[in-house]
Amino acid sequence: MMLRRKLSVVALAAGAVLAGCSSTPSDDVTASWSPNKLYAEAKDELNSGAYDKAVPLFEKLEGRAAGTMLAQQAQLEKAYAHYKANEQAQALATLDRFMKLHPASPAYDYALYLKGIVNFNDNLGMLSFLSKQDLSERDQKAAKESFESFRELVTRFPDSRYTPDARARMTYIVNSLAQYEVHVARFYYSRGAYVAAINRAQSAISDYQDVPALEEALAILMRSYDALGMAQLRDDTRRVLEKNYPNSAYLTGGPRSTQGPWWKLW
């Protein structure tokens, strides 16, 4: 998995016992450990899924290796441990601190990627946007923040190894946000709140381009106009639907023929 790869920022061979650590409490079993050993132990805990043990070890490493690349690595590893432990707020706070302290870090692209992943809140893997989990009913604020992190990544680091996956997730997020508007419009239509349905369908159409959800947005718009007796607007919308989706099931008054989430490709 991409997030578990060793980052190039690590320079394990450069580790040495740093000055200023002599005040470590005597009951600290890590007191005599070198930064490299401390990192190795923390990494072992992380890889074994013992995130509650990994986090404090990475925190110790941050202090002992302060000012070094290994300290930067410890911050990123700690953020990842928080993420894997489903501690989203702590992960985001750690990443924000890292990016504030190290704007020129060679691992900045990874920090942006991980921040996007944390907000994306996806534990199913790189291709989970093909699963049955429908993001249209999830927290849209987090989705937008995730999109912004990915957008900064692909803009600033177009050649990053994380950019291709970030682009794919950006497309998925845009589709999800559009579908959310349609989801709300559908709800209003089903309750007879046709003006509200029109407003949400129009938001989807105006804010998003070339996304699958627009077909249903047009259909809801057409039917809402019809329910309100607005024949001219209904017919105009129908012509747009016919032009863009000539084979749409909505044109015959039936539901869309596909089954499952709108974004599931196969």
Regions found by a protein language model. Give the residues of each.
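Sec-dependent N-terminal signal peptides
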Residues: 9-15
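Acidic, polar-rich low-complexity tracts and alpha-helical solenoid repeat scaffolds
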Residues: 2-8, 21-266
